[in-house]
């Protein structure tokens, strides 16, 4: 039985579980007053890819509050799967906005889950490296972060090589799977399953947070991966069969109709519904042309992921996981 829960808006105090007071207060100030050429604004990462728009603080607090509400539902045992598609703002740092992310709701959600669950696994399937989440937990062995992403020179955020493995007590608890352009469903699933199988056995998580950005999908303006919602769905199914409390978040996705297709397909999968292939008539129906169907066809781009290189990455990850205490 699925249900919709009205989310709360996160208070400044709740957001300060991760973010600094100074950053939150500055975001609140510029959100209300606009940017008065305050020199601190750029230091806080505001501008460029995180422009100051009126009401952005309230919007961030709403996204953060929804993720916290979802985490609370899991903690209280009211559900086993909770979803917040507007969430997944995985780039924000504790005192800095980054990559369209003004707040790191994923980190807030993980911290909330840790009030009950000792070991939390974070899996990031966005096109971009989940750097903000990895950084937040790079020194702890209580949160393992796994990120599958595009890694190539000049591609944002430029981090997440296979050699980035965490620090101090968190050494070997950060897992990065750097991929190249053109990857399709079958190979992606093979890699994802191969890594997660080892992770599950080694880390034995008590709860999972999944970030499912849709910028990996064919047709995205990023023109990088060549996935379909079915491929992401297969990875999601693999995680859900663990039967653990699972918090599901959105993320990137810059072809809006395809992002809607993807998250609709995944929502149906989560609640066990089969959807008609035809897009129903609604206000934005014309956006779904020329074929007006739920399915997305991969493009004819080559897969740049060399099989031998992929095997080397997987062997390296397996070797690192053997060192997890």
UniProtKB/Swiss-Prot annotation:
Manner of cofactor binding, per the entry note: Binds 1 divalent metal cation per subunit.
Coiled coil start-end: none
EC number: 3.5.1.98, 3.5.1.-
Nucleus in keyword set: yes
Biological process (GO), any one: heterochromatin formation
Enzymatic class: hydrolase
Domain of life: Eukaryota
Binding site for a divalent metal cation: 126, 128, 215
Compartments where found: Nucleus; Chromosome; Cytoplasm
Keyword Cytoplasm: yes
Reactions it catalyzes: N(6)-acetyl-L-lysyl-[histone] + H2O = L-lysyl-[histone] + acetate; N(6)-acetyl-L-lysyl-[protein] + H2O = L-lysyl-[protein] + acetate; N(6)-(2E)-butenoyl-L-lysyl-[protein] + H2O = (2E)-2-butenoate + L-lysyl-[protein]
Keywords: Chromatin regulator, Chromosome, Cytoplasm, Hydrolase, Metal-binding, Nucleus, Repressor, Transcription, Transcription regulation
Gene3D superfamilies: Histone deacetylase domain
GO-annotated cellular components: chromosome; cytoplasm; nucleus
UniProt cross-references to PANTHER family, sorted A to Z: HISTONE DEACETYLASE 8 (PTHR10625:SF14), HISTONE DEACETYLASE HDAC1-RELATED (PTHR10625)
Function: Histone deacetylase that catalyzes the deacetylation of lysine residues on the N-terminal part of the core histones (H2A, H2B, H3 and H4). Histone deacetylation gives a tag for epigenetic repression and plays an important role in transcriptional regulation, cell cycle progression and developmental events. Histone deacetylases act via the formation of large multiprotein complexes. Also involved in the deacetylation of non-histone proteins.
Family designation: Belongs to the histone deacetylase family. HD type 1 subfamily.
Name this polypeptide is given: Histone deacetylase 8
Native organism taxonomy: Eukaryota, Metazoa, Chordata, Craniata, Vertebrata
Encoding gene, per UniProt annotation: hdac8
């Amino acid at each position: 039985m699925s249900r919709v829960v009205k989310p709360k808006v996160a208070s400044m105090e709740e957001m300060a579980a991760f973010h600094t007071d100074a950053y939150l207060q500055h975001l609140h100030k510029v959100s209300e007053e606009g940017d008065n050429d305050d020199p601190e604004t750029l230091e806080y990462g505001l501008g460029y890819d995180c422009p100051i728009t009126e009401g952005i603080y309230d919007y961030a607090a709403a996204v953060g509050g929804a993720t916290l509400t979802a985490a609370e539902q899991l903690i209280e045992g009211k559900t086993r799967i909770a979803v917040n598609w507007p969430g997944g703002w995985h780039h924000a740092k504790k005192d800095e906005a980054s990559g369209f992310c003004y707040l790191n709701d994923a980190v807030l959600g993980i911290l909330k889950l840790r009030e009950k669950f000792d070991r939390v696994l974070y899996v990031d399937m966005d096109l971009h490296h989940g750097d903000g989440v990895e950084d937040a937990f790079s020194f702890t062995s209580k949160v393992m972060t796994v990120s599958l992403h595009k890694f190539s020179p000049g591609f944002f955020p430029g981090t997440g090589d296979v050699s980035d493995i965490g620090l101090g007590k968190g050494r070997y608890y950060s897992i990065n799977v750097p991929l190249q352009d053109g990857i399709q469903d079958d190979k992606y699933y093979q890699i994802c399953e191969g890594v997660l199988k080892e992770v599950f056995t080694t880390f034995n998580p008590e709860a999972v947070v999944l970030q499912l950005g849709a910028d990996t999908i064919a047709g995205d303006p990023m023109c990088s991966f060549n996935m379909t919602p079915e491929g992401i769905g297969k990875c999601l199914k693999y995680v859900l069969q663990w039967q653990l409390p699972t918090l599901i978040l959105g993320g990137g996705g810059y072809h809006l109709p395809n992002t809607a297709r993807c998250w609709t397909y995944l929502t149906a999968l989560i609640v066990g519904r089969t959807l008609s292939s035809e897009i129903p008539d609604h206000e934005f129906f014309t956006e779904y042309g020329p074929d007006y169907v739920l399915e997305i066809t991969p493009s004819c781009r080559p897969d740049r992921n060399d099989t031998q290189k992929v095997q080397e990455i997987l062997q390296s990850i397996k070797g690192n996981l053997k060192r997890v205490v």
